Amino acid sequence: IQQTIMYFHKGGLVMWPLLFCSIAVIAIAIERFLFYKAEDSGQPFAAKYCELLRANEREEAFQLAEATNGECAKIVADAAKITEGREQQKAFLESQAGIFIAKLKNKLDYLAIIVTMSPLLGLLGTIVGMIGAFSIFNLESGAPIAITGGIGEALIATATGLCVAILSLCAHSYFAHRMDNMITDMEQCFSALLEAETRSGK
């Protein structure tokens, strides 16, 4: 821990915004993980729901949606209660899908910003540190001293910035992939429900 604190101070003032970025990445990752876990109805639900609708077992599909957690299951269960016909259901599904996708994308832009910003902050810290290292001169001989050590310390900021960026990139890629899977499952369920409504003549 003491060595970590020592490196932190050697990295310069830019280490503070990098620390804030790393804390933000961890906080966003935890919040998004819990949100996705709560809102994801799961691929098995989507597959079973579509299978039941294609088999014209609409009541069983409705009961499955009612008994399943997650936003996708809730939306299709609510849509099945609409009695005005297919067009009303379609409008409801589209509006709810837009709201849900916006919720899924929430805070992911922050991770993307940190991916780009962290290496730049690290580079800035390194440049400032190198300027400081090259400005040190031995007043007696006129020769620069401690330049190598100064550059080594300055590179701490770049290394830290890259680590934060990699962490943020991994988190962003994971949640973007999971979001794509959830959207795909949702679209499959919506299509199956609308096809079932078409077959029923509503």
Kindly label every feature range from the protein language model.
Residues 31, 153, 187:
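Acidic-residue sensor for enzyme active/binding pockets
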Residues 12, 26, 61, 76, ...:
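Residue-level signature of catalytic and energy-coupling elements of molecular machines
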Residues 2-11, 94-118, 144-156:
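Alpha-helical membrane-interface segments at transmembrane helix boundaries
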Residues 17-30, 114-124, 160-164:
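Lipid-exposed faces of alpha-helical membrane segments in multi-pass integral membrane proteins
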Residues 39-124, 128-139, 171-202:
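Predominantly long cytosolic amphipathic alpha-helical stalk/bundle segments
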Residues 145, 149-172, 176:
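Pore-lining and gate-forming transmembrane alpha-helices of multi-pass membrane transport proteins
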Residues 1-44, 171:
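Hydrophobic membrane-targeting segments
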